[in-house]
Regions:
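Outer-membrane beta-barrel translocator domains and adjoining extracellular loop/strand segments
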Residues: 45-49, 84-90, 123-127, 147-152, ...
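Residues that define the transmembrane beta-barrel architecture of outer-membrane proteins
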Residues: 28, 51-55, 104-108, 131, ...
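Residues on the lipid-exposed face of transmembrane beta-strands in outer-membrane beta-barrel proteins
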Residues: 34-38, 59-63, 110-114, 137-141, ...
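Predominantly the C-terminal beta-signal and adjacent terminal strand-loop region
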Residues: 105, 167-229
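Gram-negative (and chloroplast) outer-membrane scaffold detector with strong preference
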Residues: 67-148, 216
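Short glycine/proline- and aromatic-enriched beta-strand/turn motifs that initiate or cap beta-hairpins
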Residues: 21-62, 211-221
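Outer-membrane beta-barrel channels and translocator barrels
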Residues: 27, 64-68, 117-119, 165-167, ...
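Bacterial Sec-dependent N-terminal signal peptides
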Residues: 1-27
Length: 229
């Protein structure tokens, strides 16, 4: 009888420990880290975002609203380049001598990210996943500097990505972003076709980034305070 009672108590204790471990999935408010990748320009002097890809680096900060949603600040530094020789178009000003540029670009983007599944270590009783895909969109600012002129303009970043929780505090992310700028002068030339246009995105330049990032999570949430238990 005593042996059976002790066995029952031991079983209850083990189940309690397992349940506590299963629910032990800390959530953190903030992440900070860095990223590296490539940047490519698409505009009048480069017909494909896969041409002339240049290295870039970034600083990444993220505020986690909940396991599905977060806000991300991404500040990237890179290069964009292109040439009139890269496209088949005719440019009146460069009919005899080709035009080429190699500009430095700084981008600051603030986006809203939505995870398709709840993001976590996978130990959480809510069924959080350590690997999740996500989509995002927001607003950004672009500063491009080169030999022709310096340009400051707004951009609209849209993209997709995936992130993996390596450990409780360490995260790896991969994302691709297309930045639709509101300027046609990131390449240093406005309207090389000499054709008038109108509208916010009429004949404007864009650029894309492919980035791998590593971030560290901190500032744990009080789950009782946030009524998450």
């Amino acid at each position: 009888m005593i042996r059976n009672l002790c066995s029952l108590l031991l079983l209850i204790s083990l189940l309690s420990v397992q349940k506590a471990q299963a629910q032990d999935d800390p959530q953190y408010r903030l992440e900070i880290g860095a990223g590296i990748g490539t940047m490519a320009y698409e505009g009048d002097f480069n017909g494909s975002i896969f041409k002339n890809m240049q290295p870039m680096a970034a600083v990444v900060g993220r505020y986690n609203i909940d396991p599905y949603k977060d806000l991300r600040l991404n500040i990237g530094f890179g290069k964009i380049k292109g040439s009139s020789d890269n496209v088949d178009s005719y440019f009146p000003d460069y009919a005899e001598q080709s035009y080429a540029f190699n500009n430095t670009l700084v981008d600051a983007s603030f986006v809203f990210e939505y995870n398709f599944w709840p993001y976590g270590t996978g130990r959480d009783y809510r069924g959080a996943k350590p690997l999740v895909p996500f989509i995002f969109g927001g607003l950004g600012a672009t500063y491009a500097t080169g030999s022709e002129k310096n340009v400051f303009t707004a951009n609209i970043p849209l993209g997709i990505g995936a992130k993996y929780k390596v450990s409780e505090r360490l995260n790896i992310g991969l994302d691709w972003t297309i930045h639709f700028s509101l300027s046609d002068e990131l390449d240093g030339v406005k309207d090389p076709y000499r054709v008038s246009s109108s509208g916010a995105f009429k004949n404007t330049d864009s650029y894309s980034t492919l980035q791998v990032s590593l971030t560290y999570s901190f500032s744990a949430k009080c789950r009782t305070c946030n009524k998450e238990d």
